[in-house]
Amino acid sequence: MTESTFPNYPRLVLSKGREKSLLRRHPWVFSGAVSRLEGKANPGETIDIVDHQGKWLARGAWSPASQIRARVWTFDKTEPVDIAFFTRRLRQAQHWRDWLAKKDGLDSYRLIAGESDGLPGVTIDRFGHFLVLQLLSAGAEYQRAALISALQTCYPDCAIYDRSDVAVRKKEGMALAQGPVTGELPPALLPIEEHGMKLLVDIQGGHKTGYYLDQRDSRLATRRYVENQRVLNCFSYTGGFAVSALMGGCRQVVSVDTSQDALDIARQNVELNQLDLSKAEFVRDDVFKLLRAYRERGEKFDVIIMDPPKFVENKSQLMGACRGYKDINMLAIQLLNPGGILLTFSCSGLMTSDLFQKIIADAAIDAGRDVQFIEQFRQAADHPVIATYPEGLYLKGFACRVM
């Protein structure tokens, strides 16, 4: 397709001086940068983005209900947004995942990581021959049919299941969506393999797309710290860290979560790997309350894993989230024996690594303990971060030695 045969896209005109982020290839246009929309565009429809003088900058998706008014599909003026576009993006992403899966022996991984794979608002996780889809923006939803067609071209033997039941869709003016798209339904619990572990994944009812693939490498790293140690696994979900700790030779692992269903799957995961169930304890409780109760009882641990859910959704919640992270890490530090290890994480995108490190330092001061930072973590390599979109680095963590 030549430029002259392109559709006459509506044009989003930016205010003077507001094109700088696009010139640096950042994929978002915020509402404050917009001067006007020339022409009519439905939510999610493709638009051209131009500066105040009409100079072409990018091609993206219009989202009038969101503070992010447009998300960029391409910075190439000659590239149309069609089925072939999505097919190219999928194949580019698969090339890296194929190498990674072969190298690490994976049958499950993140296939598309949104903006970092050139598909803003699109998340696709692969579990065996199931592709689990999340469409989180108006543009992604508008292109649903094209994206599914591209998936069927690239992965004709895979079933597709939609888990777009995510609250963020409401910010884009969209209803939640969930259910089979093509192929058979996923089983209630699908076994996958990760670094020598067998793990059961609940695609239909589990968190996110069913499992936290981003913590794969952190779960493996846990093994070096746990031999003959007593481990506390907070916010344990379905027990990936617990299974890894048992494979690393821990003396005991206590897994804590508020969901009994998740704890039941965690127990099954221990049994599935033929590990010693007598070394695993499963506690349904609120982590904050339980840590305080442990402190009052004088309980001590050698390793504590702290992997909480996202505490902050927007900037207005950041200060409160900082207090929450500090309190929970302070409690964990107080429960550790001298020389104990705290493995602590934040999956909040607004929480920078530097800020998180400062929070842990403040927590150590409040706990009256010295802490050494000995290892740093981030999301696994199938969750890449494109250089022009630093927000893609959402998961950060530290291994800390508590003196």
From Swiss-Prot:
Residues 9-88 form the PUA domain. Keywords: Cytoplasm, Methyltransferase, RNA-binding, rRNA processing, S-adenosyl-L-methionine, Transferase. PROSITE patterns: PUA. Disulfide bonds: none annotated. InterPro entries: PUA, PUA-like_sf, PUA_sf, RLMI, RlmI-like_PUA, SAM-dep_methyl-trfase, SAM-dependent_MTases_sf. One of its GO terms (cellular component) is cytoplasm. GO terms for molecular function: RNA binding; rRNA (cytosine) methyltransferase activity. The keyword Disulfide bond does not apply. The keyword Nucleus does not apply. It is an enzyme of class 2 (transferase). SMART domains: PUA (SM00359). Its main location: cytoplasm. Gene3D superfamilies: PUA domain, RNA methyltransferase domain (HRMD) like, Vaccinia Virus protein VP39. It catalyses: cytidine(1962) in 23S rRNA + S-adenosyl-L-methionine = 5-methylcytidine(1962) in 23S rRNA + S-adenosyl-L-homocysteine + H(+). Specifically methylates the cytosine at position 1962 (m5C1962) of 23S rRNA. Belongs to the methyltransferase superfamily. RlmI family. PANTHER family: RIBOSOMAL RNA LARGE SUBUNIT METHYLTRANSFERASE, S-ADENOSYLMETHIONINE-DEPENDENT METHYLTRANSFERASE DOMAIN-CONTAINING PROTEIN. This is Ribosomal RNA large subunit methyltransferase I. It comes from Salmonella arizonae (strain ATCC BAA-731 / CDC346-86 / RSK2980).
